C-alpha cells in the first residue's frame, strides 16, 4: 500500500508496514533533554532503579533555557543535569563552553539524521523534521521511559499535505509561510497530525526557512512537521560528521493524506500574528495601518535566530538607528552562528544601530530573562508563541513576525513594513 514519509519512517523502525492511527512501539534514535526538562526525567530515571542509559549515544542534554544561570534556582536546576551527564560520561552534553539553543545546535552538530525517530522534552522538537526525520515533543516522564528502554509508544499520525506554489516575494520567508498556514487552519487545525510541506516554494526555500516552518508545526497542534530530503538538505549535511547513516524516505504517489492544502506563496505579504494566538495573522500592510507603537523588538530563538536571520536584520539595520523609545535585543541561536556573524561584521552593525546582542539562549522567548516585558509593553518578536504572559507581564503583548519586520519595527518604533524603508 502507498505510504507517507512519516508512515515509512515508522515502518522502518518497527519492521513492518504501519499506517496512520496505528498504535506502535518504536525505537528512538535520539532523545533530547534540556536544563529545564531533564531534571524531572533524571528523577524518574533514578526512581525506576535504572543505572544505565539504554542508548547512551542516542541521548543528549543541551543547556539552553537559563544558561548562564539567571539565579540560584536555575543554577541548582542546571547542576542536576551536569551531575548526571558527568556521572554517565555523556558523549552529547552541551553546556556553556559550546552553547546553543537545542533545535539549532543539534542539526549543526550532525546529531539529527534523515530517517531518524527523535523525541525531546520540548514542544519545538518538531523543528528537526526539516531534515526528513520524524521528530516530536513529549513530556519529561516519556523522556525518562526512553532513557531507560530506548523506545516509546506512538499513534502513527495522519498527515496533512501542504503544497506551496509560486515564488516568495521580497522580505517574505519561511516564517511567513508557517504563520499563514496557522492563520488558515487555526491553532488546533493539525492536532496530532504530521504536517508535510512540499511544492516549488519549498524546493526553493533554504534550510533556515525550513527549520522555521517545522519548528512552528506545533503551533497548529501538529505532532510533527516534515520536509522530504532534497539537494538543499544534502548540501546542509555535507561535511557534517553525522551520528549515523542517513535514510531517505519519500511519500508515495497516492499516499493516504487526511487533507491536502494548497497555498499560493507568491500572493503573500510578510505575516504578523497578533496577540494572543499565532493564528491571529494579518499582513504587514494591514498591521502598518493599525499604527501600533512598540517598546521592544526581539530577533532570536529556535525559530529565527539563525545566520540568515541575522543577515536579514543587518541588511535592514545598516546605517540606521533603533528608535529612541524602543529596545532591540538580538540573540544568535548558537555560538557558531554568533562567531560567523562576528566575522561577517554583523555584530558591528547591530551595536552601532543601538541593539543589545546576548549570548545564545532561549531566554527572552519564554519570558525567562534577557528581554522580559513589563506591564503593558509590546514586542515584535521572531519567536513562536504569543499567549498571555509568554514573554513577561500578563498585560504585555507579543506580535510574531519575521526578522526583517522585527528589525524594521525597531527602527520605526512601531510595526513597520521592511519593504517601505
Curated annotation (Swiss-Prot):
For biological process, the GO terms are:
L-leucine biosynthetic process
Where does this protein hold [4Fe-4S] cluster?
302, 362, 365
State a single Pfam family of this protein.
Answer: Aconitase
Q: Which cofactor does it need?
A: [4Fe-4S] cluster
Which reaction does this enzyme catalyse, per its entry? Answer: (2R,3S)-3-isopropylmalate = (2S)-2-isopropylmalate
Manner of cofactor binding, per the entry note: Binds 1 [4Fe-4S] cluster per subunit.
EC category: lyase
Q: What is its EC number?
A: 4.2.1.33
Pathway participation: Amino-acid biosynthesis; L-leucine biosynthesis; L-leucine from 3-methyl-2-oxobutanoate: step 2/4
Q: Which GO terms describe its molecular function?
A: 3-isopropylmalate dehydratase activity; 4 iron, 4 sulfur cluster binding; metal ion binding
InterPro entries (alphabetical)? Acnase/IPM_dHydase_lsu_aba_1/3, Acoase/IPM_deHydtase_lsu_aba, Aconitase_4Fe-4S_BS, Aconitase_4Fe-4S_dom, HAcnase/IPMdehydase_lsu_prok, Homoacnase/IPMdehydase_lsu, IPM_dehydratase_rel_enz, IPMI_cat
Keywords, comma-separated and alphabetical: 4Fe-4S, Amino-acid biosynthesis, Branched-chain amino acid biosynthesis, Iron, Iron-sulfur, Leucine biosynthesis, Lyase, Metal-binding
Work out whether the entry's keyword set contains Iron-sulfur.
Answer: yes
Query: What is known about what this protein does?
Result: Catalyzes the isomerization between 2-isopropylmalate and 3-isopropylmalate, via the formation of 2-isopropylmaleate.
**Listed NCBIfam families:** hacA_fam, IPMI_arch, LEU2, PRK00402.1
What family name appears in the similarity comment?
Belongs to the aconitase/IPM isomerase family. LeuC type 2 subfamily.
What HAMAP family does this protein map onto?
LeuC_type2
Q: Subunit comment for this entry? A: Heterodimer of LeuC and LeuD.
Protein name per UniProt: 3-isopropylmalate dehydratase large subunit
What species was this sequence derived from?
A: Campylobacter curvus (strain 525.92)
Q: Which gene encodes it?
A: leuC
